[in-house]
UniProtKB/Swiss-Prot annotation:
Organism of origin: Escherichia coli (strain K12)
Xref: PANTHER family: BLL0263 PROTEIN, MALONYL-COA-ACYL CARRIER PROTEIN TRANSACYLASE, MITOCHONDRIAL
Name of the featured protein: Putative uncharacterized protein YmdE
Top-level lineage group: Bacteria
Gene Ontology molecular functions: transferase activity
SUPFAM superfamilies in UniProt: FabD/lysophospholipase-like
Gene: ymdE
Length: 107
């Protein structure tokens, strides 16, 4: 996958990425990022770096406002793993297929 890092950098360099309106935690740092250039670099490094899943969840769960989790994947998997973390409200966890079929929005 190391060869893919530069290819991903090159691909992302051609995309215009705006600063996110909401917090987005990066898999490689478990921290929120707003700078498009750093977001692109973190997305590239994701190919070869360990996902900081536990650290990311701890960050989310320690935020002052309740967090909603929307899993965007082929099949529901990660949302079920949230059961391992104290403080996760399962009513605020949804897979994208269910969200689209229900046309439900977290409030």
């Amino acid at each position: 996958m190391e060869d893919g890092v530069q290819a991903m950098r090159d691909y992302l360099a051609g995309l215009d990425i705006a600063s996110p309106e909401h917090q987005v935690l990066m898999n490689v740092t478990a921290k929120s990022e707003v700078a498009p250039s750093i977001i692109k670099e973190n997305l590239s490094l994701h190919l070869t770096h360990t996902v900081k899943w536990t650290e990311s969840l701890d960050t989310f769960l320690n935020m002052p406002t309740p967090v909603a989790f929307l899993e965007i994947s082929n099949k529901p998997y990660l949302g079920n793993m949230l059961n391992d973390f104290a403080g996760v409200d399962q009513q605020r966890v949804m897979h994208c297929r269910k969200a689209f079929s229900d046309a439900k929005v977290f409030k």
